[in-house]
Protein backbone atom coordinates (compact mmCIF):
# COMPACT_ATOMS: atom_id res chain seq x y z
CA UNK A 1 0.00 0.00 0.00
CA UNK A 2 1.33 3.42 -0.94
CA UNK A 3 -0.14 6.61 0.51
CA UNK A 4 0.53 9.71 -1.59
CA UNK A 5 -1.03 13.13 -1.11
CA UNK A 6 -0.09 14.43 -4.59
CA UNK A 7 -2.65 13.17 -7.13
CA UNK A 8 -0.17 13.36 -10.03
CA UNK A 9 2.37 11.22 -8.19
CA UNK A 10 -0.32 8.80 -7.01
CA UNK A 11 -1.47 8.36 -10.63
CA UNK A 12 2.09 7.88 -11.86
CA UNK A 13 3.22 5.38 -9.21
CA UNK A 14 1.59 2.26 -10.76
CA UNK A 15 3.30 2.99 -14.10
CA UNK A 16 6.64 3.49 -12.38
CA UNK A 17 6.30 0.22 -10.47
CA UNK A 18 5.27 -1.68 -13.61
CA UNK A 19 8.35 -0.33 -15.42
CA UNK A 20 10.81 -1.34 -12.69
CA UNK A 21 9.13 -4.40 -11.15
CA UNK A 22 6.24 -5.69 -13.30
CA UNK A 23 5.62 -8.63 -10.94
CA UNK A 24 4.88 -6.23 -8.07
CA UNK A 25 2.12 -4.25 -9.78
CA UNK A 26 -0.58 -6.76 -8.73
CA UNK A 27 0.35 -6.23 -5.08
CA UNK A 28 0.29 -2.42 -5.24
CA UNK A 29 -2.60 -0.39 -3.88
CA UNK A 30 -2.26 3.39 -4.08
CA UNK A 31 -4.24 5.57 -1.70
CA UNK A 32 -4.37 9.23 -2.77
CA UNK A 33 -4.68 10.88 0.65
CA UNK A 34 -2.95 12.90 3.33
CA UNK A 35 -1.15 10.37 5.55
CA UNK A 36 -2.20 12.40 8.62
CA UNK A 37 -5.85 11.76 7.71
CA UNK A 38 -5.55 8.03 6.94
CA UNK A 39 -7.52 5.84 9.32
CA UNK A 40 -8.09 2.84 7.08
CA UNK A 41 -6.12 1.09 4.35
CA UNK A 42 -7.03 -1.70 1.89
CA UNK A 43 -4.84 -4.15 3.82
CA UNK A 44 -3.28 -3.81 7.28
CA UNK A 45 0.30 -2.56 6.79
CA UNK A 46 3.10 -4.44 8.53
CA UNK A 47 5.89 -2.02 7.64
CA UNK A 48 6.21 1.71 7.14
CA UNK A 49 8.90 2.67 4.66
CA UNK A 50 8.87 6.30 3.62
CA UNK A 51 10.72 9.36 2.45
CA UNK A 52 8.72 11.90 4.41
CA UNK A 53 8.32 15.63 3.91
CA UNK A 54 10.49 17.05 6.66
CA UNK A 55 7.89 19.44 8.05
CA UNK A 56 5.40 16.65 8.84
CA UNK A 57 7.65 13.65 9.39
CA UNK A 58 7.20 13.22 13.15
CA UNK A 59 3.40 13.69 13.10
CA UNK A 60 3.07 11.23 10.18
CA UNK A 61 5.17 8.52 11.85
CA UNK A 62 3.40 8.89 15.21
CA UNK A 63 -0.05 8.99 13.58
CA UNK A 64 0.50 5.88 11.47
CA UNK A 65 1.99 3.93 14.39
CA UNK A 66 -0.98 4.94 16.56
CA UNK A 67 -3.53 4.17 13.87
CA UNK A 68 -2.16 0.82 12.68
CA UNK A 69 -1.10 -1.67 15.35
CA UNK A 70 -0.20 -3.97 12.47
CA UNK A 71 2.92 -1.90 11.69
CA UNK A 72 5.80 -3.80 13.26
CA UNK A 73 8.76 -2.12 11.57
CA UNK A 74 9.48 1.41 10.41
CA UNK A 75 12.28 2.79 8.25
CA UNK A 76 11.88 6.44 7.33
CA UNK A 77 14.11 9.06 5.80
CA UNK A 78 13.80 12.39 7.55
CA UNK A 79 15.82 15.57 7.96
CA UNK A 80 18.97 14.82 9.99
CA UNK A 81 17.87 17.14 12.83
CA UNK A 82 14.55 15.30 13.07
CA UNK A 83 16.34 11.95 13.06
CA UNK A 84 18.54 13.17 15.91
CA UNK A 85 15.47 14.22 17.91
CA UNK A 86 13.64 10.95 17.32
CA UNK A 87 16.68 8.90 18.34
CA UNK A 88 17.87 11.11 21.21
CA UNK A 89 18.69 9.49 24.52
CA UNK A 90 17.57 10.83 27.92
CA UNK A 91 19.86 13.57 29.11
CA UNK A 92 20.89 14.75 25.67
CA UNK A 93 20.09 18.26 24.44
CA UNK A 94 17.88 16.92 21.65
CA UNK A 95 15.84 14.61 23.89
CA UNK A 96 12.24 15.74 23.95
CA UNK A 97 8.65 15.01 23.01
CA UNK A 98 9.43 13.23 19.69
CA UNK A 99 12.03 10.99 21.38
CA UNK A 100 9.71 9.93 24.18
CA UNK A 101 6.59 9.48 22.06
CA UNK A 102 8.43 7.41 19.46
CA UNK A 103 9.71 5.12 22.22
CA UNK A 104 6.14 4.47 23.36
CA UNK A 105 5.74 2.48 20.16
CA UNK A 106 9.04 0.63 20.13
CA UNK A 107 12.81 0.58 19.95
CA UNK A 108 14.07 3.59 17.99
CA UNK A 109 17.48 3.62 16.32
CA UNK A 110 19.47 5.77 13.94
CA UNK A 111 19.96 3.63 10.83
CA UNK A 112 22.28 5.80 8.75
CA UNK A 113 23.13 9.02 6.98
CA UNK A 114 21.83 10.13 3.60
CA UNK A 115 24.00 12.85 2.10
CA UNK A 116 22.36 15.85 0.50
CA UNK A 117 24.50 15.18 -2.59
CA UNK A 118 22.37 12.17 -3.60
CA UNK A 119 19.43 14.48 -4.39
CA UNK A 120 18.80 16.82 -7.27
CA UNK A 121 18.46 19.64 -6.79
CA UNK A 122 20.77 19.46 -3.79
CA UNK A 123 18.85 20.52 -0.66
CA UNK A 124 20.32 22.63 2.13
CA UNK A 125 19.92 19.83 4.69
CA UNK A 126 21.23 16.33 5.24
CA UNK A 127 18.93 13.39 5.86
CA UNK A 128 18.98 10.43 8.18
CA UNK A 129 17.30 7.05 8.34
CA UNK A 130 15.38 6.15 11.48
CA UNK A 131 14.14 2.67 12.31
CA UNK A 132 11.50 1.68 14.80
CA UNK A 133 10.83 -1.89 15.87
CA UNK A 134 7.48 -2.07 17.61
CA UNK A 135 7.36 -3.42 21.15
CA UNK A 136 4.39 -4.11 23.39
CA UNK A 137 3.05 -0.99 25.10
CA UNK A 138 3.35 -0.70 28.87
CA UNK A 139 0.51 -2.38 30.75
CA UNK A 140 -1.89 -0.47 32.96
CA UNK A 141 -1.73 2.91 31.23
CA UNK A 142 -3.11 4.28 27.97
CA UNK A 143 -1.19 6.04 25.24
CA UNK A 144 -3.36 9.14 25.71
CA UNK A 145 -2.48 9.28 29.41
CA UNK A 146 1.23 8.89 28.74
CA UNK A 147 1.24 11.41 25.87
CA UNK A 148 -0.59 13.91 28.07
CA UNK A 149 2.08 13.47 30.73
CA UNK A 150 4.83 13.84 28.11
CA UNK A 151 3.26 17.07 26.89
CA UNK A 152 3.09 18.46 30.42
CA UNK A 153 6.63 17.37 31.28
CA UNK A 154 8.19 18.99 28.22
CA UNK A 155 5.91 22.04 27.91
CA UNK A 156 8.27 24.21 29.92
CA UNK A 157 11.72 22.72 29.53
CA UNK A 158 13.42 25.28 31.75
CA UNK A 159 11.22 24.52 34.73
CA UNK A 160 11.97 21.71 37.11
CA UNK A 161 9.86 18.66 36.36
CA UNK A 162 8.04 19.09 39.67
CA UNK A 163 6.86 22.56 38.66
CA UNK A 164 6.03 21.56 35.10
CA UNK A 165 3.78 18.73 36.29
CA UNK A 166 2.12 20.61 39.16
CA UNK A 167 -1.09 21.20 37.23
CA UNK A 168 -1.15 17.87 35.42
CA UNK A 169 -3.07 15.88 38.04
CA UNK A 170 -6.44 17.50 38.75
CA UNK A 171 -6.94 18.18 42.44
CA UNK A 172 -3.25 17.86 43.21
CA UNK A 173 -1.79 21.30 43.74
CA UNK A 174 1.74 20.03 43.78
CA UNK A 175 3.69 17.01 42.70
CA UNK A 176 5.90 15.35 45.28
Regions found by a protein language model. Give the residues of each.
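Catalytic cores of RNA-modifying enzymes
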Residues: 1-152
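C-terminal lobe and adjacent flexible extensions of AdoMet/dcAdoMet transferase-like proteins
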Residues: 134, 151-176
Amino acid sequence: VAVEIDARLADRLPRTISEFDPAAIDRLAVVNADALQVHQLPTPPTMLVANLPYNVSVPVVLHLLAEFDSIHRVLVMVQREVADRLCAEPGSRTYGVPSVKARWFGDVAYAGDVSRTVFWPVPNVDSGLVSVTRTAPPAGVTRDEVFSLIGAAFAQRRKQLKSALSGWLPGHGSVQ
